[in-house]
Curated annotation (Swiss-Prot):
Sequence repeat copies, ranges: 17-20, 25-28, 31-34, 38-41
Gene Ontology molecular function: any one: structural constituent of cuticle
Notes concerning its domains: The tetrapeptide (A-A-P-[AV]) repeats found throughout the protein are also present in many proteins constituting the protective envelope of other species.
Protein's UniProt name: Cuticle protein 32
Function summary: Component of the cuticle of migratory locust which contains more than 100 different structural proteins.
Cystine pairs: none
Superkingdom as given in the UniProt entry: Eukaryota
UniProt KW keywords: Cuticle, Repeat
Length: 41
């Protein structure tokens, strides 16, 4: 993230950003099938 860029360059920023992106995406990925199953009902 931006803090990572400030505290050690692109590598550190990417190391912080990747887990954050996964943690944010995981609930959406998990919810998508539930929404698609619920939609017809």
């Amino acid at each position: 993230g931006l803090l990572g860029l400030g505290y050690g360059g692109y590598g550190y920023g990417a190391a912080l950003a990747a887990p954050a992106a996964v943690s944010y995406a995981a609930p959406a990925i998990a919810a998508a099938p539930a929404v698609s199953y619920a939609a017809p009902a």
